[in-house]
């Protein structure tokens, strides 16, 4: 929906529920509200849907810049994933990664990791369906009386990292302000490295322990299923913290660290670095899957549990159901 049409709509009547953030938590929340017949509008400051399930095209192909994969153990989320799989949007990737550490390299088995041939963002886009998502809309303020940039709402959902939500909230909204202030987040950089050829041994993905630069490296060609000679590296929080002002300056160090780790003789043909100031929640306290207070402010995301795609989806889904029950 174009911004002008959105503005005409919300000035003609109350906006219903305004969801700020079109990542998987915000979209899952809005989906539940729409299903229950509750009027809902989604505002997203970026040009695309997806949030930290971010994919961007480099050299003609998508690469995942945020979440590296997702796992499934919730039956309801499994049903969503089954629909993605049936539509050709999601695929089982691997249940075995490797880990590099002081003792060398070893295989690590675990749950099945899922990937998306067209990028993880495509999954959020499918979930959004026909939801009224307005992109390129930067929300500036959420005030008492439930006013979003001066427009009344029946409830407001902030589906984003706590430090970003704090910038929008009027301090008079005390419960939500306290909730977002309690969140702690860690940064990361992701580097997309396109090499001349696949010179590395088969590893799919690698946890890197005790390294000054790297925390995870994924074979994006294997993950995507096209065999492209592309690696995506994720840095440690400590390394990222020193490069948040100029993330592109970290590109040589990230590339060299990957080449040293995997013994790659040739430099990358191209390299791109993306900054995540709030990459993942550092800690979670409590058992609640979302926040919803008497002021009508809801918070959702992977801060309400382990930092996983499934956590964010369930948080948004649960909040959407709670709001539908309150407003229905």
Predicted features and spans:
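Active-site substrate-recognition segment that forms the wall
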Residues: 192-244, 253, 257, 261-262
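Flavin (FAD/FMN) cofactor-binding core of flavoprotein oxidoreductases
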Residues: 252, 259-295
């Amino acid at each position: 929906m174009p911004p002008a049409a959105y503005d005409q709509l919300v000035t003609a009547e109350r906006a219903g529920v305004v969801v700020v953030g079109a990542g998987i938590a915000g979209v899952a929340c809005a989906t539940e509200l729409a299903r229950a017949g509750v009027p809902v509008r989604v505002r997203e400051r970026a040009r695309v849907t997806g949030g930290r399930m971010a994919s961007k095209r480099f050299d003609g192909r998508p690469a995942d810049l945020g979440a590296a994969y997702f796992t499934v153990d919730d039956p309801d989320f499994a049903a969503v994933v089954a629909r993605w799989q049936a539509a050709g949007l999601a695929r089982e990737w691997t249940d075995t990664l490797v880990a590099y550490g002081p003792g060398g390299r070893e295989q690590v088995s675990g749950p099945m990791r899922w990937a998306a041939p067209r990028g993880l963002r495509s999954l959020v886009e499918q979930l959004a369906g026909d939801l009224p998502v307005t992109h390129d809309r930067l929300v500036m303020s959420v005030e008492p009386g439930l006013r979003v940039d001066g427009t009344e709402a029946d409830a407001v959902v902030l589906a984003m990292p706590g430090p970003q939500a704090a910038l929008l909230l009027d301090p008079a909204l005390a419960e939500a302000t306290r909730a977002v202030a309690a969140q702690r987040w860690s940064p990361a950089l992701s580097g997309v490295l396109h090499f001349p050829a696949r010179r590395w041994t088969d590893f799919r993905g690698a946890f890197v322990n005790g390294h000054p630069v790297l925390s995870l490296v994924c074979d994006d060609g294997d993950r995507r299923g096209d065999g492209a000679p592309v690696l995506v590296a994720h840095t440690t929080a400590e390394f990222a913290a020193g490069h948040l002002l100029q993330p592109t300056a970290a590109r040589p160090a990230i590339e060299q660290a990957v080449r040293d780790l995997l013994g790659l003789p040739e430099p990358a043909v191209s390299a791109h670095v993306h900054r995540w100031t709030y990459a993942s929640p550092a800690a979670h306290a409590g058992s609640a899957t979302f926040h919803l207070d008497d002021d009508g402010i809801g918070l959702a995301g992977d801060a309400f549990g382990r930092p996983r795609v499934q956590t964010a989806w369930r948080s948004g889904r649960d909040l959407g159901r709670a709001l539908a029950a309150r407003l229905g």
